[in-house]
């Protein structure tokens, strides 16, 4: 009994200690909150800006996302697919293997005097390089409704390939008058393969683009491969875009079944733990760059990014070399069948049209991405657009960079939420929901002030007596019935 009395005597001292602890805790919280408010109110950012403005630039966006870029070296792809490039607006090249290629020249000088092309005879006598000729055949078969054979001349003396197409659209009137001719079709195919300003659209008649040029001939010849490409880097995209348009009616599915599958990693990242790495042979100025499964998984979910197309091409090239050990001709035959599983031809055509319209476009050679300095995760690289032959300045697409940073932050929050949900017991979540609901209901009940007893109007509180609706109490203290009452809390 004495212990109980002692305990109750110490209660005021205990309460004083608790109050001291509460005051100390609240003081610490207030100081921390004040420091946070000062850090986020903008004054420190303003002071930093005023101190560094005009002296230093930063590649950090949204405080945590660092801006990087990479340049792809597509010269290694020539083992399995033709690469095209331009020396200038009139001289264009296709590289096949490491030593040979085709030169496509827009010129006003004819090199073949006759007007016929006996291709079947050359094929029967095996006069030409089959790999080169298959590329030429792809170009020729892409010309719509070719039936004017006088528009084409060829010569295969001693294995030398010489093909000459006649062009006749030097001005707006000629282009309009000959819009449906073979020459217009030749120029349209050439314009789709090489993003060149030497050919321009003069008009559009019933959906057919009428193309004009100052040149009279398109000449295709085989050539030894040198360092021709000064105007543009070697790229397979032009030739592959022709292939995809020719074959899309026959290969409807975008996934090549059988020998190769083009899933870079599955949704959980089991195929390639750590993502996908670009090696020295694929990059310019870098030895190695890896992208995690978070970025690469987006390539498997959708077929709508230029960088994903390039990864598929590099992956195709690597697997073809390691598994097939094929010669050039066999590789070209394989890429003919696989093209629709590798690239999105709609993306290629969209970028081509953007170039023709003078809008910044993607040339598939340079990409930018963001790196999260906290987690080390990277975004899926996006194409660094080109206009007037040069890459855009970083400030010209800063809005897209900010949006990508926002997307990465949102994706991080979503993943953290999913992770938290997966590690939290379901019963604990139910208990939290019940306790929160109970608390909100109790607050509501407290706010509505439910009455607890009756008063006689104009009289003081009758407690501890409990009046009934007749204003009387069974103890007899209130015994005058019929007085007006009201509920009170």
Curated annotation (Swiss-Prot):
Chain sites annotated for binding Zn(2+) 2: 453, 455, 461
Gene3D superfamilies noted in UniProt: 6.10.140.1590, Arenavirus glycoprotein, zinc binding domain
Residue ranges, Extracellular side: 2-17, 59-430
Stretches of the chain found on the membrane's Cytoplasmic side: 34-58, 452-489
GO terms for biological process, alphabetical: fusion of virus membrane with host endosome membrane; receptor-mediated endocytosis of virus by host cell; virion attachment to host cell
Residues at the site labelled Important for GP-C-mediated membrane fusion: 33
Chain positions recorded as Zn(2+) 1 binding sites: 57, 465, 473, 475
Family assignment from sequence similarity: Belongs to the arenaviridae GPC protein family.
MF GO annotations: metal ion binding
Protein name according to UniProt: Pre-glycoprotein polyprotein GP complex
Glycosylation sites recorded in the entry for this protein: 78, 88, 98, 108, 118, 166, 222, 363, 371, 388, 393
Domain of life: Viruses
GO cellular component: host cell endoplasmic reticulum membrane; host cell Golgi membrane; host cell plasma membrane; membrane; viral envelope; virion membrane
Lipid-attached positions, N-myristoyl glycine: 2
Transmembrane portions of the chain: 18-33, 431-451
Cleavage, annotated site positions: 58-59, 257-258
Keyword annotations from UniProtKB, A to Z: Disulfide bond, Fusion of virus membrane with host endosomal membrane, Fusion of virus membrane with host membrane, Glycoprotein, Host cell membrane, Host endoplasmic reticulum, Host Golgi apparatus, Host membrane, Host-virus interaction, Lipoprotein, Membrane, Metal-binding, Myristate, Transmembrane, Transmembrane helix, Viral attachment to host cell, Viral envelope protein, Viral penetration into host cytoplasm, Virion, Virus endocytosis by host, Virus entry into host cell, Zinc
Keyword presence, Nucleotidyltransferase: no
Disulfide links within the chain: 85-229, 117-154, 179-210, 277-290, 299-308, 362-383
């Amino acid at each position: 009994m004495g212990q109980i009395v002692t305990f109750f005597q110490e209660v005021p001292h205990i309460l004083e200690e608790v109050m001291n602890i509460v005051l100390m805790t609240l003081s610490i919280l207030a100081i921390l909150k004040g420091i946070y408010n000062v850090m986020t109110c903008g004054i420190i950012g303003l002071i930093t800006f005023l101190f560094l403005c005009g002296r230093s630039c930063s590649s950090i966006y949204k405080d945590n996302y660092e801006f990087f870029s990479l340049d792809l070296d597509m010269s290694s792809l020539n083992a399995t697919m033709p690469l095209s490039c331009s020396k200038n607006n009139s001289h264009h090249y296709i590289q096949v293997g490491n030593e040979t290629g085709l030169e496509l020249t827009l010129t006003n000088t004819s090199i073949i005097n006759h007007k016929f092309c006996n291709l079947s005879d050359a094929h029967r006598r095996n006069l030409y390089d089959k790999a080169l000729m298959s590329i030429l055949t792809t170009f020729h078969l892409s010309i719509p409704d070719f039936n004017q054979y006088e528009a084409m001349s060829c010569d295969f003396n001693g294995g030398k390939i010489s093909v000459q197409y006649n062009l006749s659209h030097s001005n707006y009137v000629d282009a309009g008058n000959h819009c449906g001719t073979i020459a217009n079709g030749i120029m349209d195919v050439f314009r789709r393969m090489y993003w060149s300003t030497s050919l321009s659209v003069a008009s559009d008649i019933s959906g057919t683009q009428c193309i004009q040029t100052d040149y009279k001939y398109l000449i295709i010849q085989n050539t030894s491969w040198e360092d021709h490409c000064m105007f543009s880097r070697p790229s397979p995209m032009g030739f592959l875009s022709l292939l995809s348009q020719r074959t899309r009616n026959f290969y409807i599915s975008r996934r090549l079944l059988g020998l190769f599958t083009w899933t870079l990693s599955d949704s959980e990242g089991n195929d390639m733990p750590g993502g996908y790495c670009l090696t020295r042979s694929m990059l310019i100025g870098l030895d190695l760059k890896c992208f995690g499964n978070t970025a690469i998984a987006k390539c498997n979910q959708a077929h709508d990014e230029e960088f994903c197309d390039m990864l598929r091409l590099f992956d195709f090239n690597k697997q073809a070399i390691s598994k097939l050990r094929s010669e050039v001709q066999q590789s070209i035959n394989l890429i003919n069948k696989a093209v629709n599983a590798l690239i999105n031809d709609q993306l290629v055509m969209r970028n081509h049209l953007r170039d023709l319209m003078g809008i910044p476009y993607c040339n598939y050679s340079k990409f930018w991405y963001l790196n999260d300095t906290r987690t080390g995760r990277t975004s899926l690289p996006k194409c660094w657009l080109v206009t007037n032959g040069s890459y855009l300045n970083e400030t010209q697409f800063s809005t897209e960079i900010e949006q990508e940073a926002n997307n990465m932050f949102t994706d991080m929050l979503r993943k953290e939420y999913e992770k938290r949900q997966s590690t939290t017991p379901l019963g604990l979540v139910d208990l939290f929901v019940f306790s929160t609901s109970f608390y909100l209901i109790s607050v509501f009940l407290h706010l509505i002030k439910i009455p607890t007893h009756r008063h006689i109007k104009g009289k003081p509180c009758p407690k501890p007596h409990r009046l009934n609706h007749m204003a009387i109490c069974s103890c007899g203290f209130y015994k005058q019935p019929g007085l007006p009452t009201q509920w009170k809390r």
